[in-house]
Amino acid sequence: VEPHDTYCLIRQDGGQTLGYFPGSGVRILYSDGYAFKDLNRNGILDCYEDWRYTPEERAEDLAKRLSVEEIAGLMLYSSHQAVPTDSVGYWSSTYNGTSLRESGLPHSAVSDKQRKFLRDDNLRAVLVVRVESPRIAAEWNNNMQAFVEGLGQGIPVNISSDPRNETRAWAEYNAGSGGKISLWPSPLGL
């Protein structure tokens, strides 16, 4: 196990490299000399957790385990998310019940609203509208993944954003890019 600042890696000869967040509650199971993440924390190596099975076999096994509520959550997108969220206004939220500044948490923290839709609504597709910087966005993504790794079946978050590569893209969509994106005419005319 290779410990890093906020996560651990397990490199395996002849097997998959696993990354996990120690604080998520996910345990590591061993079978035939290989390590696997116990994503649903049941102490059993289930088919969907076993990377030796095909993607189709794993997906079928996972689908059988999901409740109707979990399936519905996987079919939905979040509202627009700012990273970090504002303390007032349309994209506002709290952090441990207070503003981000008052909470003392880093700008990459997962907001209360985000925790709620991930935990209670089972959402895993998150639409990002504004980020402070590429570094904060990457750290926030890692924090989101750490949070959901300890929920339900351990399904990760899919992060996406509205189109950002148009020459006429609005400032809020490009605010956190640091100017390091390619700009293309819109529409491309293909």
Regions found by a protein language model. Name each.
Residues E2-L190:
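N-terminal beta-rich core of secreted/periplasmic extracellular enzymes
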